[in-house]
Amino acid sequence: MSTITVRDAKIEDAARILEIYAYYVEYTVISFEWDVPSLEEFENRMRDIMKKYPYLVIEQNGKIEGYAYAHAFVGRAAYDWSSELTIYLDPNARKGGLGRRLYEELADRLKKMGILNLYACIGYPQVEDEYLTKNSAEFHAHLGFELVGTFHNCGYKFDRWYDMVWMEKIIGEPHAGQPAVKPYSEVKE
């Protein structure tokens, strides 16, 4: 029986996390990024996110098999209660429930911070090909996200144009006098 653990990422995890991400940059349009960032650049990205938001890894038998994090939706004060999510799993670890577990943990932590709305920006093919399928959008829909917008031909990679969709999941109720969102460092256990 395998042991599955979700925990906060550490900067020391960056090399393994980058190894997972590099696959998606080099071989897919799941990431619209063209070049794999350096380890130093990736560590800096992690540090910036960790200043306010959770950055999680999921381990199976002690090996990091995926990661997910939240970050600012737009970067203006009025949007503080909304967060964009990102998730990547080792390509050999997909379809085993790890993504669901990781996203559920992330959503729980964001809810404790006071986040109300979750958003996912997803590459979407007009026609599925070897670089991009509709699996990510279907995964998000399965977790309760709803399609809220499509940007046509907005990403160009591997000499092809791809659409991008935004999906949304509401996890809290807005009201007048909404308490400020707390940094993750104040709510993590």
Identify the residue ranges that each predicted region occupies.
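Conserved GNAT-fold acetyl-CoA-binding loop/helix
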Residues: 18-45
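Acetyl-CoA-dependent GNAT
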Residues: 36-82, 86-92, 104, 109, ...
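A short beta-loop-alpha structural element at the N-terminal edge
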Residues: 5-17
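Conserved GNAT acetyl-CoA-binding A-motif
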Residues: 110-132
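Conserved catalytic-core motifs of GNAT/GCN5-like acyltransferases
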Residues: 69, 121-123, 137, 141-160, ...
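Conserved acetyl-CoA-binding loop-helix of GNAT-fold acetyltransferases
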Residues: 95-111, 133-138
